Amino acid sequence: MAKVSKRVAANKAKIERTKFYPIDEALGLVKGCASAKFDESIDVAVQLGIDAKKSDQVVRGSVVLPAGTGKSVRVAVFAQGEKAEAAKAAGADIVGMEDLAEQVKAGNLNFDVVIASPDTMRIVGTLGQILGPRGLMPNPKVGTVTPDVAQAVKNAKAGQVQFRVDKAGIIHATIGRRSFDDAALKSNLSALLEALVKSKPATSKGVYLRKIAVSSTMGVGVRVEQASLSA
């Protein structure tokens, strides 16, 4: 353990907080500083050139990461009839209507994503106080309220991540695990950044992607030189 601690400490000492590193070097430093015994997530923080206080500049959406997230996701779906059967065939873990709503009200939230067909929102809408604070409330902006529930299930299982800008104008997202190779992490980061650019508010002026930093679950943030992302 002492050797591991010394290695991690040495790697942390290499990081200059104000320096912007080429993406390959940044990922190497992040992995080198990952000291937890579990497979830490690799996270990204993107500072956007927006005014998060303005309602027309709230950036929100979702993207399917090409290399996945490295996490097994349980999906619950509110649907009935043919759509319910399609959701089950697509791999949904829980499918229901009033019965599923009762499970939620009872505190049985054994799922990571909730998807709803538009015609079920009369039921789902009553669960806002439970699902909302947990980030589970279905929303058309992130593709979780949709007529095509089967495709939404497939997206969730394939590694779809949702993003929403915080009050400081920063997007936080996970782009993989420490065990991922750099190519997988870079492809996921590129997909996320592309989705963010597509979600740029029309009223946003100036530089949009201002700063990008990567980190591990228990590690420090490393700033990324944006020019290296297109190299």
Swiss-Prot record:
Pfam families xref list: Ribosomal_L1
Keyword rRNA-binding: yes
GO cellular component: cytosolic large ribosomal subunit
Coiled-coil intervals: none
One MF term in the entry's GO annotations: tRNA binding
GO biological process terms, semicolon-separated: regulation of translation; translation
SUPFAM superfamilies: Ribosomal protein L1 (SSF56808)
Keywords: Repressor, Ribonucleoprotein, Ribosomal protein, RNA-binding, rRNA-binding, Translation regulation, tRNA-binding
Recorded family membership: Belongs to the universal ribosomal protein uL1 family.
Family matches, as PANTHER family: 54S RIBOSOMAL PROTEIN L1, MITOCHONDRIAL, LARGE RIBOSOMAL SUBUNIT PROTEIN UL1M
Protein function: Binds directly to 23S rRNA. The L1 stalk is quite mobile in the ribosome, and is involved in E site tRNA release.
NCBIfam families xref list: rplA_bact
Quaternary structure, from the entry: Part of the 50S ribosomal subunit.
Name listed for the protein in its UniProt record: Large ribosomal subunit protein uL1
Organism listed in the record: Cupriavidus necator (strain ATCC 17699 / DSM 428 / KCTC 22496 / NCIMB 10442 / H16 / Stanier 337) (Ralstonia eutropha)
